[in-house]
Each structure stands twice: as structure tokens, then as C-alpha cells.
Design a protein with these regions (language model features):
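Short, low-complexity N-terminal intrinsically disordered segments enriched in polar/charged residues
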Residues: 1-19, 23-27
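A generic "alpha-helical surface" signal
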Residues: 4-8, 48, 104
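Generic N-terminal initiation segments characterized by hydrophobic and/or small/turn-forming residues
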Residues: 13-14, 47, 90, 102
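A solvent-exposed, acidic/Ser-Thr-rich amphipathic alpha-helical stretch
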Residues: 22-90
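A beta-strand edge to alpha-helix "cap/lid" segment located at domain peripheries
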Residues: 59-135
């Protein structure tokens, strides 16, 4: 496990999402990945579902005239038999066209990363929001 590899993975991963590259961003998940967030009634399973959610988010930001930037910080990582468990704080900054940036959300992101063909991929992601009770 190399912390620089993990940092570079998250930088590329979030730049794809923030840049509107929904399909490429979904490609940084395993084909059978699980993505769970408080805004979802059920976890999304599979790369196709993750891509659909990302496309909807990109379209929503465009309609709102906002740019979002995901800031991944304070990442800890440990190797397990199933891959790498990574826990990060994530702040999402939203900037409306012609306006001032604001903190949109503050979250904790818990990932299980795996290596496939030498590349890190997200196999599982669980997000909790700081403004909502856990559970």
C-alpha cells in the first residue's frame, strides 16, 4: 500500500466527477461496486447504476449553474485481506456562476479499495453526512 498512490487516485477520481466525466468516474469503481449515501433510499450496485447517478448529478449542477469541487482530506488507509480500507473527510464546495463559494456538504467517506490490473478501484463506498445522524 502506497499512500501517494491513494492520494493520486482520489485526486483523479474527484477531478473526473467535478469535471462532469460521469462515465470515466464510474470507471474508477469495480463492475460490481456498492455505493451507499444518505441521499439514496437503497445502495446503488454496479458501475452502470453509479454512472447513471453521476450523470444525474452533473445535469443537476449544470441546471443550477453551479460548479462543485470535492475536497478529500485527512485520509487514513490500512491494508486488509479484502483490499484497502480508506476513510476520508470530504467537503463539497459549491460555487454558483458569478457568486461566492460555500460549503455545500461535509461528509465522511469510507471506501474499500482494490487493485485490478495495477489500478486502484472503489469496490465499496459508504458516505455519512455531518449534518445527519449516523445509522
Amino acid at each position: 500500500m502506497n499512500s501517494t498512490d491513494i492520494q493520486q487516485f482520489y485526486a483523479r477520481h474527484m477531478q473526473l466527477l467535478d469535471g462532469g466525466a460521469a462515465e470515466a468516474w464510474a470507471g474508477t469503481f469495480t463492475a460490481d461496486a456498492v455505493f451507499a449515501a444518505p441521499s439514496m433510499t437503497e445502495p446503488v450496485r454496479g458501475r452502470d447504476g453509479i454512472a447513471a447517478g453521476a450523470r444525474a448529478a452533473v445535469e443537476g449542477r449544470a441546471a443550477a449553474g453551479e460548479v462543485h469541487r470535492h475536497w478529500v482530506t485527512m485520509t487514513t488507509a490500512r491494508s486488509t485481506g479484502a483490499g484497502i480500507e480508506a476513510v476520508s473527510y470530504v467537503q463539497i464546495l459549491a460555487t454558483p456562476q458569478g457568486g461566492a463559494p460555500r460549503v455545500h456538504l461535509s461528509c465522511v467517506m469510507r471506501d474499500r479499495l482494490v487493485r485490478r490490473d495495477g489500478e486502484l478501484l472503489v469496490a465499496e463506498r459508504h458516505i455519512t453526512r455531518d449534518d445527519r445522524p449516523a445509522g
